[in-house]
Structures are given as C-alpha cells and as structure tokens.
C-alpha cells in the first residue's frame, strides 16, 4: 500500500510578541533537539475471499443421459462467484490533524524516538518494535494440472469419426474401469496385489481414469481464489454504509455498480471512552527548585501526546447474511492525553510503547 508523506502546519505562538503568529511546515522525523511525529487514525480493512468457478461443458455432454443415465448436464459455459469468507483488521494511518513537535529539556535523558515509515510515533526508548506496514498479499493457489481425456482413449476411440460412437466407446471404458475396481475391492481379481498399499494405489489410479473420462460427459469446473480488500477510515458512526457490492456473475463490484447486491458495514462507537493509563496522580513526583513550582504543568504540554481510543462495534453483512462482526478500538472516536515530560527527566530512561493502529499507550516502564 502506497503512502504519501504528509505535511502539517503547526501554529506556534511567539514568546516575545503576543499578537504575532508563526506558521511552520513540519515533516515527521527525529532531530538533535527533539522530534516531529504523527499520531495515527484507525482504518478498518475488510477483506473478502472470493472463489471464482468456471464450468466448461464436456465434448460429449449431449450423450450423458443416453449412455451414463446422467441428466441435467449443462451444454453451456458458466462462470460464477461466491464469497468464501470475510475478515476484519485495523491499521494505523498518519493523522495530519495530530502532528506534534516534542522537545525534551536539556537535563533529561536523551530519548530514542521510534517512528514508522510514515512518521507515526511507535515508542520512546524502545529499540525493538514490530509493526505492520502493509497488508500481506494472498498467495495465489497453484492450479491443478488437468489430464487430457484423450490421453486415456483407446486406439478405437481415437480413430472413430463419430461423436455418437466415441460416446459409446468412452462410456464402455468407464464401465470397464468400474468393473475392475469392484473386482479388486471384492478380491476376485487374479492380478490383484496382496498388500493393502498396492491395492490403494491401483484403486486411486482407476478412480482418476474414471474421473478424466467422465469429464467428456459432465464437463469440468475450475476454481480460482482471490482476495479483495476495502479500507474505511470512519470519522463518525455508520449504519448500512455500502462498502461494495457482490454479484454471483461478476464478483466484487464498486459500491456505485448497481449490478450487484450491496455489502453493508455498521460502525457503532461505545459511549464510554477509556481513562488515561497514566494520570496526574501516577506521574512521578518532582521537587522543583524555588520559583519553578508553576512550570511543572507547562512541561506536561512538552511531553508525549498519545491517543485514548474508543471502542466500536463493526459488522459487515448483506441482506441475507452476517459475514463478520468484531469490536475494535478506534483512535478518532476517542481523545488525546499527554505523558508528562517529567517522565523523561529521570536519570533512568523511561520506556514507552504505543499501539501502531490506535496511538494508545500499550506500556510504560523503566
């Protein structure tokens, strides 16, 4: 998934001029005096596993009922699609409205800021953080090698110029194979192997030969598996939002293509937003020098800003079936808090780990 670098304009108030405003373009990154980072917004990925089935009629399909007593055999090619499964996942994308510049005091421990490739803050003083950058592409399934029925035809079958005669001979060969298989099963064949493994191998081979010759009458159906992913970045609750459409004849379609039935998604946030992991009561105590007592709260604004996401119930469904239903924390449904810079004024480095999908605090430890 290609991601574009985003630039955010941050409004900086001049310290010496109350009426003057400076606008600076920031690009995420780490410098000697601090770091610029994004917090993420949460995107919901909906992945559909689709099976495409293609039917090709057999060369002798019109004789299936006459010689094999198999009816309802189609004489026409057909392709149709079906939804095999639907999966949900979340991913963090840089939120241009949440770009921050953090600058630590000169007496603080030099922090190690870890950013993702697109500038999302992943952690502070944590050197090993794993995060997902792209959805893993589905590995295409290898198509089975199809045996040509003509490779199993007798000389008489290959020499005949009549389809009716070919159908008669092919049906006779199928019946011969079935008879041989039954004889082996009943152990009445003089040439039947005595060991069980040998019998199994011969029975499997006879079954394969029958299946290949049957394709002349019943046709062949091939299948292909593909994955289609839609990504939604919710800003508010949603009900019966159409993320795509599905057609048995055409497969997954664009939401505006009325040739398919709608696929809906419901996103409903909870009314309760989680409390901050770190509150003012749990922040480390300081003994500031005389005359600096009022500066502690101001230093909090210079700390690490993180998200407090709100959970949302996500449901993907059609008019006839519910395909997926999960609950996820969504960054943009919650609010933000600040981890005080006082944490990083200690001699010992404080380790902070954030969720790459939501920007929430996962761990704070020494």
PLM features: what roles do these ranges have?
Residues 15-19:
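Sec/Tat signal peptide C-region and signal peptidase I cleavage site
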């Amino acid at each position: 998934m290609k991601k574009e670098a985003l630039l955010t304009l941050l409004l900086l108030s001049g310290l010496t001029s109350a009426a003057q405003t400076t606008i600076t373009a920031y690009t995420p990154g780490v410098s000697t005096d601090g770091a610029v980072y994004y917090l993420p917004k949460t995107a919901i990925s909906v992945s559909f596993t689709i099976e495409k089935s293609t039917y090709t009629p057999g060369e002798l399909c019109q004789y299936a009922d006459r010689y094999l007593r198999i009816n309802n055999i189609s004489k026409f090619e057909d392709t149709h699609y079906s939804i095999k499964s639907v999966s949900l996942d979340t991913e963090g994308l840089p939120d241009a409205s949440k770009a921050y510049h953090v600058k630590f005091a000169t007496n603080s421990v030099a922090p190690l800021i870890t950013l993702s490739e697109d500038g999302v803050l992943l952690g502070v003083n944590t050197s090993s953080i794993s995060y997902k950058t792209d959805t893993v592409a589905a590995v295409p399934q290898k198509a089975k090698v199809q045996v040509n029925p003509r490779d199993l035809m007798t000389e008489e079958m290959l020499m005949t110029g009549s389809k009716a005669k070919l159908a008669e001979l092919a049906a006779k060969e199928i019946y011969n194979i079935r008879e041989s298989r039954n004889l082996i099963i009943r152990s009445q064949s003089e040439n039947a192997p005595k060991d069980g493994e040998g019998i199994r191998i011969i029975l499997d081979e006879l079954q394969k030969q029958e299946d290949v010759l049957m394709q002349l009458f019943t046709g062949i159906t091939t299948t292909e598996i593909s994955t289609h992913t839609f990504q939604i970045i919710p800003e508010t609750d949603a009900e019966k939002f159409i993320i795509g459409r599905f057609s048995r004849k055409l497969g997954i379609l664009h939401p505006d293509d009325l040739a398919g039935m709608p696929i809906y998604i419901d996103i409903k946030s909870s009314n309760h937003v989680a409390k901050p992991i770190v509150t003012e009561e749990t922040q480390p105590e300081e003994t500031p020098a005389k005359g600096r007592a009022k500066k502690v709260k101001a230093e909090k604004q210079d700390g690490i800003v993180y998200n407090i996401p709100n959970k949302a119930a996500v449901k993907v469904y059609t008019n006839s079936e519910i395909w997926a239903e999960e609950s996820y924390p969504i960054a943009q449904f919650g609010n933000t808090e600040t981890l005080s810079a006082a944490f990083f004024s200690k001699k010992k480095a404080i380790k902070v780990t954030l969720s790459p999908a939501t920007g929430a605090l996962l761990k704070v430890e020494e």
